[in-house]
Amino acid sequence: MTHSCRLSVAPMLDWTDRHCRYFHRLMTKETLLYTEMITTGAIIHGKGDFLAYNQEEHPVALQLGGSNPQDLATCAKLAAERGYDEVNLNVGCPSDRVQNGRFGACLMAEPQLVADCVAAMKEVVDIPVTVKTRIGIDDQDSYEFLTDFVSIVSEKGGCEQFTIHARKAWLSGLSPKENREIPPLDYPRAYQLKKDFSHLTIAINGGVKSLEEAKEHLQHLDGVMIGREAYQSPYLLASVDQELFGSQSPIKKRRQIVEEMYPYIEQQLANGAYLGHMTRHMLGLFQNMPGARQWRRHISENAHKPGSGIEVLQQALAKIPQELDV
């Protein structure tokens, strides 16, 4: 494997698009970045280039939603040809829309099908094929249910890496948002899974809010995936390389990161992109700092205006007190 899963940013629908990933990559060279989940149907039949990304994003993984082995193999092959570093199968998303398409968390109940999907993808690509799943679904939440799933998908499908969202999913009655918050976290179950499947690479996801917490999990597991916290307080990514990968590079200041976004933004604007689609990912950069609210407000109120450019960010940056060396 050419990249590490030691720390990754979770695939998050409507959030981890290519603009977001470019922004995150400015802060960390080592963190593995994931696309939003993209369905096989969108890639095979949709209009538009759903696989577009920037070369600077590497290492970057494509997360696929689907349950047809042949379609998944087709998409995995396209991803590998485009240079993605990993393909990940979504077996964790609980939304009704996803279930109706017969993919996501409901696939936990069909481990042989998941194994077939993984095997079909592995047959056509040399890059890692991984699975992101939950610890259970509905009332099927025993440890045995999880170990049966991992056994079948690893032995029959050849999957060597699993990211475990340490909550079960309720397939009805809870919204996707509630499914990320209401089912209790069970980290020890993921730790036990690593003990029982020591030959597999096991990463954890769910509720991780700091690099200190990530370090604690890394005492027991191979990797940690951070979701909402990395999006809402993205500056935590700025010290990942130093804290978790031993980098000697200086940690970038927030102002430097904003300024490093300017050339990218100008290039994207020239290609017809909309400023707000890029700046929305940057709103949390000054989280909990003096001037943070003014920074967010100025961007939110101005980025959507016709003809807006990097001057919106320059003006927003001026709202942060100059004496702060941030």
From Swiss-Prot:
Describe the reaction catalysed, as an equation: 5,6-dihydrouridine(20) in tRNA + NADP(+) = uridine(20) in tRNA + NADPH + H(+); 5,6-dihydrouridine(20) in tRNA + NAD(+) = uridine(20) in tRNA + NADH + H(+); 5,6-dihydrouridine(20a) in tRNA + NADP(+) = uridine(20a) in tRNA + NADPH + H(+); 5,6-dihydrouridine(20a) in tRNA + NAD(+) = uridine(20a) in tRNA + NADH + H(+)
Query: Which CDD domains does the annotation name?
Result: DUS_like_FMN (cd02801)
| Amino acids binding FMN | P11, M12, L13, Q63, K132, H165, N205, G206, G207, G227, R228
- Active site, renumbered: C93 (proton donor)
- What keywords were assigned to this record? Flavoprotein, FMN, NADP, Oxidoreductase, RNA-binding, tRNA processing, tRNA-binding
Q: Show the SUPFAM superfamilies listed in the entry.
A: FMN-linked oxidoreductases
| Principal EC category | oxidoreductase
Per its Swiss-Prot or TrEMBL entry, what cofactor is needed? FMN
**Pfam family for this entry, one:** Dus
* Record carries keyword tRNA processing: yes
Gene Ontology molecular functions: flavin adenine dinucleotide binding; FMN binding; tRNA binding; tRNA-dihydrouridine20 synthase activity; tRNA-dihydrouridine20a synthase activity
Q: Where is this site: Interacts with tRNA?
A: N90, K177, R180, R293, R296
Its Enzyme Commission number(s) read 1.3.1.-, 1.3.1.91
Q: Which family does it belong to?
A: Belongs to the Dus family. DusA subfamily.
Q: What does this protein do?
A: Catalyzes the synthesis of 5,6-dihydrouridine (D), a modified base found in the D-loop of most tRNAs, via the reduction of the C5-C6 double bond in target uridines. Specifically modifies U20 and U20a in tRNAs.
- PANTHER family named among the record's database cross-references: FMN-LINKED OXIDOREDUCTASES SUPERFAMILY PROTEIN
Indicate what this protein is called per its UniProt record. Answer: tRNA-dihydrouridine(20/20a) synthase
List the lineage, top down: Bacteria, Pseudomonadati, Pseudomonadota, Gammaproteobacteria, Vibrionales
